[in-house]
């Protein structure tokens, strides 16, 4: 069983010995009686019944039959309280640890002689490498993107040799992971830790080259199912945000067979115990039996994992996502761990599971993993970021990696002595883990050199690895690898089947989860249904039956247009299915690759459970539209119409699902999906009737699902008896004439053919969706390798002879360990600034009481988060803001920094004695957020240039600004990676600690006097944290005021601070003031409080401080630390200092600036403009794909409408040409709007951070986003030229330069306003899903009222206003009149005989001489959409705090 971690809560045992002894005797007697009753049960019942003893405190929850007394219960019928009671008994220790439970389970196995299965993992001569670009060639610019495509083609054709450098990630490493021993994996950044874990889990990316052997119990990875044997716990937290923590773990337990594993164990165990007359522990027996039964709702295994991971307090909270509120980052990390360890796998490969956790929580989790390893003889290899000394000591063995080489592997207790033998000693008050991660660093190694009589010479990782191989530990390891391995044939340990439970059970689990997700997304589905109703009402009132009559072909064409629009709307209403599918893929891929379930078990519920939704959509549209428009009134035709809509909606959902699963990326799906939809739309039989389709497109016509739907719906309507009137233009009926004129069949059986084909397509698309899920892998973008070889003549230290490099060699300078500018005690850097003191006194902060708490009966209207908080932040003083989770650290920092946009603030906040003015304060303050949010497509240097240009005063020269940026880069050790692309967090670009240093540097280049830092070391390993803290310390030494919130830090990081503000839950201060040398002031203060446990020698003061001030400690001591502090001399000293510093110095005035921002709006605009141009230039997946799609779409259009531009013989020819232009405008415009949304969405998150930092006002930013306008304009211009020139000459419009130019102008303006509309949709909605849904409604209305489906002359007066505000209508008007408005060729058609321009004027309402007005209107639409986007950016914030 692999679910193991530590109970986080601490319970204090109450020692009442006499009462305790008598209670124990009573419980024992009761247990004997219950066990006797149990033994009288038939064998079948004994497997499902267990003895549940009374709660130790007599306050147990009900179990379906009583409270607190012992019972013989059927474990299958236990409710939630009953399960909790069983769990309490199993875990009942003073520490709520799992040691006793696991020891009891192991003892039960030992008692009957059953062995616990064991797995030994070996890897020998393992090398992992890849080929990468370096320097500027690695940047994803448009040129490089095209270059890469051409290069791949030439290489595959053997016409070019690869121009890449070999990067060795793991270099000939060997080792053994023993069962029953906890193994820690340590190493600095980029040392290959994650790659080693992935290699052992058989999860390496297919692009990586691997050599060497990995074996489990001597069996190669291809001889058994690795994923069911081992669990790789990733650094990335991919979860479905709508599910709660409990639901996430329940699903994982069902899929991994957590209960089934217990059943297998119990079968043999119970039989052997019965044979030998062994009576098991009632608590252990009850736990194991309860865990062995699968439950739909209440699962004991899930409750156990929740408890030991400390997630029980948030079990029913949604996990959440980037835009949806959920659990904290640390809790989400524990959910990731729980999801994998809940199953039966006994080999755990755990990759940095402690990110975001305080050291106390990490200790408890690792401690219980240790219990699991030692008792159940499991195999665990765990990498940790900053293991505290007490956590480090829990491990048995250590693997130390550096630059892809193993430099130590062996017992953890010998590692210090080993490095001492190499000449490196551990300093006092230094954690061993921190020492080990720094001793290989070129910059840090010298400080650990023990022999001061000799000069230190740097010992490289390669040299250390060679020395290790020759050491006693290396030879012992080699001997281990040479020996044979047992348990080779253990089928229980090394399963060969892929799935742990029957596939029917997996399908049930997936169905249950999908039902939950549908219920959680009910707003989205309700919104979409209401949208169908809304568009249906508009459609029915537009084609109102009082205005249409089934008497002639002209009216019939309007009926046909209405039917066609209904089909198109139902089809495109499923577009959001593609967005939702793509958003769910990361979680699916994780679970698929871990064999949670097969792909079809995921796709089947997606398909089946959308059937009722399709039915509802069809019913709503049919009921709203059918009789209001006045279609054929017989009931059978109404229900056939509804069936057809249901069929096309099901087909569309399958189509969009399939497109999402194949594309796997929103931009690619939108772009290439649009090309597919374009062909389906054009060849559906309405825009281009069958008789006009070119021979080379006949095949596409016959496979277009829309064609079958168009035929079926047309036959259903026009074969009705009311259309049997003989036409005035021939001997056939009006209905037959309409069908024949549009090349549609007249046989009624085509309805059933259409429905059958649509349903067949639905099945086909869902099968393809399933196959895509099963066989395609996620699109992975490689990390940019951009060392400092760009632009200044420096190289990458690459051996061009062998062309082979390790990570350390390629990134030799990436962490700034060479060539660093010395800046130990700079007094102010290049730019002067004013040192400032911040005082705050009796600060209170309230928010409105959450509705959930009001519903539980809480009477107060406000919830207080900060309570009378007072303190001082001074120049040259580094202050730590510390407290348990929920104590209000970040809240206080946000209040002081002016980042809170809601709530109620009370108290006195002063800057150097003057009242704080937020508009002024924002100019002199920096705020380093916990989340490192940056534009992915810019480099490090560009990020700093952008910040400095916008935030430094405009009177600073460019040269001075450049020198200042250079100095800051040196200060934070980023100068060696100045040309590295920032990239997307966790995917590409900078490492975590490099991003953190960049976040700090972005604030430093603003030359602030006061800097707030929220968790600057969170998510970093010890070495990276040391680099960041060195940066922070250097910043303080320049004379600035710096305050940091921080989790429980290591000793050396904690003691880098000068002062401390310690808070407890409820936002109350329990210590404020100096830390002292070796934290002596703080230690003396707390040890002066009676009965506080004194600190032991060498113990981390930060850990001790937080342990002795917990709520449990307060209860034990009977005191309130906040009250103790308020009555202390320490508090009085702080108060006196606040009073002293709250008085302004004589002759000083409050800070004043002439404007809110450092730069004027024109400068803000130009800087934002340049940044957006860089973002676009380096977004090839957006721009290259878009231009490629435009080329493909142009060729499709040109070939479908080949040479129809000069064909002007009938009204049908004119309408065909109009259809071509209508489809071109609509489809390419919609594609532009859809593909720009992901780009804008990413940059919006960056905007929120930059706007909060007062970099610029919202208008210049939004104006520069027009470069999502102005930057977009060159790309739209190229797009226009590609599409316009190809289609103009292929369609064969009139060879007239004026008409060509006008055609290009209209296309350019159309693409522009569609692009701006896509930005508006993002600006007005909180998520991309919602933007997609809202957009589809607008696209439908623009399609309906564009003047193509229903001419302007036939639009009712109550809707004509919408026609004039429909941008597509103006595009169509402009393009048609520019091409045909002056044509006098005579044409004939139903009800018309005259010239072309007369037809345009009389039937379509297009008048000549409107060219200038039409261009002006289209420009106005572009300006209007841009203005709405600018206003939305300024006024709406979907991340309000």
UniProtKB/Swiss-Prot annotation:
Alphabetized GO MF terms: ABC-type transporter activity; ATP binding; ATP hydrolysis activity
Pfam family, one: ABC2_membrane
Any one GO cellular component localisation term in the record: plasma membrane
Entry-linked CDD domains: ABCG_PDR_domain2 (cd03232)
Region: Disordered, residue numbers: 52-71
Binding positions (ATP 1): 187-194
Keyword Transport: yes
Coiled coil: none
Keywords of the record: ATP-binding, Membrane, Nucleotide-binding, Repeat, Transmembrane, Transmembrane helix, Transport
Recorded superkingdom: Eukaryota
SUPFAM superfamilies: P-loop containing nucleoside triphosphate hydrolases
Family stated for the protein in its record: Belongs to the ABC transporter superfamily. ABCG family. PDR (TC 3.A.1.205) subfamily.
Reported function: May be a general defense protein.
Protein name: ABC transporter G family member 51
């Amino acid at each position: 069983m692999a679910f193991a971690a530590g109970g986080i809560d601490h319970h204090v045992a109450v020692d009442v010995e006499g009462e305790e002894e008598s209670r124990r005797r009573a419980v024992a007697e009761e247990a004997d009686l219950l066990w006797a009753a149990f033994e009288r049960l038939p064998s079948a019942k004994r497997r499902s019944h267990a003895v549940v003893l009374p709660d130790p405190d007599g306050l147990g929850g009900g179990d379906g039959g009583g409270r607190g007394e012992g019972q013989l219960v059927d474990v299958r019928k236990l409710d939630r309280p009953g399960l909790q009671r069983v769990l309490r008994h199993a875990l009942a220790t003073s520490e709520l640890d799992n040691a006793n439970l696991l020891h009891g389970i192991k003892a039960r196995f030992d008692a009957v002689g059953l062995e616990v299965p064991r797995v030994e993992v070996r890897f020998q001569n393992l090398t992992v490498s890849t080929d990468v670009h370096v320097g500027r060639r690695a940047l994803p610019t448009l040129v490089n993107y095209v270059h890469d495509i051409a290069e791949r083609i030439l290489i595959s054709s053997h016409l070019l040799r690869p121009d890449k450098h070999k990067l060795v990630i793991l270099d000939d490493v060997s080792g053994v992971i023993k069962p029953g021993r906890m193994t820690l994996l340590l190493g600095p950044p980029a040392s290959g830790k994650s790659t080693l874990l992935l290699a052992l889990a058989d999860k390496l990316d297919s692009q990586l080259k691997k050599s060497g052997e990995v074996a489990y119990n001597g069996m190669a990875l291809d001889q058994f199912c690795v994923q069911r044997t081992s669990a790789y716990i990733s650094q990335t937290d991919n979860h479905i945000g709508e599910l709660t923590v409990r639901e996430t773990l329940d699903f994982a337990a069902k899929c991994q067979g957590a209960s089934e594993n217990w059943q297998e164990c119990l079968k043999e165990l119970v039989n052997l115990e019965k044979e030998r007359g062994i009576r098991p522990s009632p608590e252990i027996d009850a736990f194991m039996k309860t865990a062995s039964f699968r439950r739909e709702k209440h699962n004991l295994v899930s409750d156990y994992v929740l408890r030991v991971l400390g997630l029980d307090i948030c079990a029913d909270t949604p996990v959440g996502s980037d835009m949806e509120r959920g659990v904290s980052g640390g809790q989400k990390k524990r959910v990731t761990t729980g999801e994998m360890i809940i199953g039966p796998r006994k080999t755990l490969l755990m990759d940095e599971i402690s990110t975001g956790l305080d050291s106390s929580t990490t200790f408890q989790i690792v401690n219980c993993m240790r219990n699991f390893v030692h008792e159940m003889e499991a195999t665990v290899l765990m990498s940790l970021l900053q293991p505290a000394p007490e956590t480090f000591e829990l491990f048995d063995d250590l693997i130390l990696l550096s630059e892809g080489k193993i430099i130590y592997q062996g017992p953890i207790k010998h590692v210090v002595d080993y490095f001492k033998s190499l000449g490196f000693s551990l300093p006092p008050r230094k954690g061993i883990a921190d020492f080990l991660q720094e001793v290989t660093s070129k910059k840090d190694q010298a400080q650990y050199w023990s022999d001061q009589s000799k000069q230190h010479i740097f010992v490289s990782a390669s040299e250390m690895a060679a020395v290790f191989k020759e050491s006693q530990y290396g030879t012992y390891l080699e001997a281990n690898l040479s020996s044979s391995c047992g348990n080779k044939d253990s089928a229980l340990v090394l399963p060969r089947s892929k799935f742990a439970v029957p596939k029917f059970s997996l399908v049930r689990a997936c169905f249950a989860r999908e039902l939950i997700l549908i219920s959680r997304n009910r707003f989205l589905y309700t919104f979409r249904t209401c949208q169908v109703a809304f568009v249906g009402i508009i459609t029915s009132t537009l084609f109102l039956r009082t205005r249409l009559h089934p008497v002639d072909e002209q009216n019939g064409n309007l009926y046909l247009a209405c039917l066609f629009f209904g089909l198109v709307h139902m089809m495109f209403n499923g577009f959001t299915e593609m967005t939702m599918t793509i958003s769910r893929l990361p979680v699916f891929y994780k679970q698929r690759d871990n064999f949670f379930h097969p792909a079809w078990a995921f796709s089947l519920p997606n398909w089946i459970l959308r059937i009722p939704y399709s039915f509802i959509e069809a019913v709503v549209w049919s009921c709203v539209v059918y009789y209001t428009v006045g279609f054929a009134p017989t009931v059978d035709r109404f229900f056939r119409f509804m069936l057809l809509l249901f069929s096309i909606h099901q087909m569309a959902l399958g189509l969009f699902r399939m497109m999402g699963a194949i594309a796997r990326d929103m931009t690619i799906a939108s772009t290439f999906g649009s090309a597919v939809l374009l062909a389906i739309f054009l060849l559906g039989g309405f825009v281009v009737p069958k008789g006009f389709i070119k021979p080379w497109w006949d095949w596409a016509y016959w496979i277009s699902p829309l064609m079958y739907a168009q035929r079926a719906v047309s036959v259903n309507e026009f074969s009705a008896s009311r259309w049997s009137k003989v036409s005035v233009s021939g001997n056939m009926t009006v209905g037959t004439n309409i069908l024949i004129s549009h090349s549609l069949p007249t046989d009624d059986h085509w309805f059933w053919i259409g429905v059958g084909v649509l349903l067949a397509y639905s099945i086909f698309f869902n099968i393809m969706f399933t196959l895509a899920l099963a066989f395609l892998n996620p699109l992975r973008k490689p990390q940019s390798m951009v060392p400092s070889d760009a632009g200044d003549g420096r190289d990458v230290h690459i051996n061009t002879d062998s062309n082979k490099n390790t990570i350390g060699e390629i990134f030799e300078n990436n962490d700034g360990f060479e060539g660093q500018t010395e800046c130990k005690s700079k007094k102010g850097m290049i730019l002067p600034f004013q040192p400032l003191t911040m005082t705050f006194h009796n600060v209170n902060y309230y928010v409105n009481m959450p509705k959930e708490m009001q519903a539980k009966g809480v009477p107060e209207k406000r919830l207080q988060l900060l309570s009378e908080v007072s303190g001082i932040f001074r120049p040259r003083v580094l202050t730590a803001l510390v407290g348990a989770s929920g104590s209000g650290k970040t809240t206080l920092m946000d209040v002081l920094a002016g980042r809170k946009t809601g709530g109620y603030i009370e108290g006195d906040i002063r800057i150097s004695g003057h009242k704080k003015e937020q508009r002024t304060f924002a100019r002199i303050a920096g705020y380093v957020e916990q989340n490192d949010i940056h534009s992915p497509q810019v480099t490090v240097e560009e990020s700093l240039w952008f910040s400095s240009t916008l935030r430094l005063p405009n009177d600073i020269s460019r040269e001075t600004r450049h020198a200042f940026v250079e100095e800051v880069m040196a200060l934070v050790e980023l100068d060696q990676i100045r040309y590295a692309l920032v990239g997307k967090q966790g995917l590409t670009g900078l490492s975590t600690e490099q991003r953190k240093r960049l976040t700090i540097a972005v604030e430093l280049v603003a030359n602030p006097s006061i800097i707030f830092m929220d968790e600057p070391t969170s998510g970093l390993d010890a070495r990276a944290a040391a680099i960041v803290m060195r940066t922070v310390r250097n910043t303080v030494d320049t004379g600035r005021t710096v305050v940091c919130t921080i989790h429980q830090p290591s000793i050396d990081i904690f003691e880098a601070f000068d002062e401390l503000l310690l808070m407890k839950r409820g936002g109350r201060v329990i210590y404020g003031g100096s830390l002292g040398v070796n934290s002596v002031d703080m230690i003396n203060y707390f040890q002066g409080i009676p009965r506080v446990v004194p600190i032991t020698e060498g113990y981390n003061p930060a850990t001790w401080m937080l342990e002795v001030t917990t709520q449990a400690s307060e209860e034990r001591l009977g005191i309130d630390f906040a009250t103790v502090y308020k009555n202390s001399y320490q508090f009085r000293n702080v108060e006196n200092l606040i009073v002293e510093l709250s008085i302004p110095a004589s002759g000083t005035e409050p800070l004043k600036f002439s404007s809110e921002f450092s730069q004027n709006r024109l400068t803000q605009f130009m800087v934002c403009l340049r940044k957006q141009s860089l973002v676009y230039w380096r977004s090839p997946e957006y721009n290259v794909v878009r231009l490629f799609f435009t080329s493909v779409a142009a060729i499709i259009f040109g070939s479908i409408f080949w040479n129809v531009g000069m064909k002007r013989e009938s009204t049908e020819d004119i309408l065909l040409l109009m259809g071509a232009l209508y489809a071109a405008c609509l489809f390419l415009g919609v594609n532009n709007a859809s593909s720009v949304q992901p780009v804008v969405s990413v940059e919006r998150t960056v905007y929120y951070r930059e706007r909060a930092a007062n970099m610029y006002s919202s208008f210049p930013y939004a104006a520069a986003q027009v470069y999502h306008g102005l930057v977009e304009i060159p790309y739209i211009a190229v797009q226009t030229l590609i599409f316009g020139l190809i289609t103009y000459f292929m369609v064969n419009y009139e060879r007239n330069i004026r008409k060509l130019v006008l055609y290009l102008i209209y296309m350019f303006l159309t693409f522009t306003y569609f692009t701006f509309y896509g930005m508006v949709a993002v600006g007005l909605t909180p998520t991309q899903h919602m933007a997609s849904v809202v957009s589809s409604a607008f696209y439908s209305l623009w399609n309906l009222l564009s003047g193509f489906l229903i001419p302007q002359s036939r639009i009712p007066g109550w809707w004509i206003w919408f026609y004039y505000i429909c941008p597509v209508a103006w595009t169509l008007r402009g393009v048609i009149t520019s091409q045909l408005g002056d044509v006098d060729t005579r044409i004939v058609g139903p009800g018309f005989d005259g010239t072309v321009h007369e037809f345009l004027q009389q039937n379509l309402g297009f008048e000549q001489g409107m060219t200038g007005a039409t261009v002006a209107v289209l420009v106005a639409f572009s300006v209007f959409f841009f203005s709405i986007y600018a206003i939305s950016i300024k006024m709406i914030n979907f991340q309000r705090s």
